[in-house]
Amino acid sequence: MDNYLKAALSVEQLKVSYVQNKKRLPVLDGISFVLEKGKILALLGESGSGKSTCGKSLIGVLPPSAKIDSGTVRFGNGDYVDISDNDINWKTIRGMRIGMIYQDAQLALNPVKTIRVHFEETLRNKPFPSKEAMEKVCYDMLRLLNFDDPERVLNAYPFELSG
């Protein structure tokens, strides 16, 4: 793909399989796409076609039964990310430069945890120098989403927020 330099995200030949009863079951067989900066991309397909597997692969949250067989992912200005589980770049990218919105957002949030806890769980693997620095990122993210009172939102439970 020669468009990757102007892309926000470039995925090349991503192959993912699941292991079930000691058998390898391919789910993604060489998916490739480019998402240009400022554009929106939607993955459409029937149930079981690999949409969620693709998204989970990109943010590194596949279940233990899944394996990324091969592929490359480039973020932003052509930064190469080895999509193996051991790549340290995942920690600096996941949750900060890429994320996933679940089909049913109500199921994605634990109702007994505050929004602050959800943020902290997402950011816990990031190299923050202090808890205050991590909190600043939480506040900044909420301000980007046009929340006027980030402190109130962080202390709220999912059911206390509307929309």
Where on the chain are the PLM-derived regions?
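Conserved structural motif at the start of ABC-family nucleotide-binding domains
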Residues: L9, L28-G30
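Conserved ABC ATPase "signature" region
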Residues: A133-R152
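Conserved ABC ATPase signature
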Residues: N155-L161
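Q-loop/switch helix immediately C-terminal to the Walker
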Residues: D104, P111-N125, V137
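Conserved ABC transporter NBD signature motif
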Residues: K67-V81
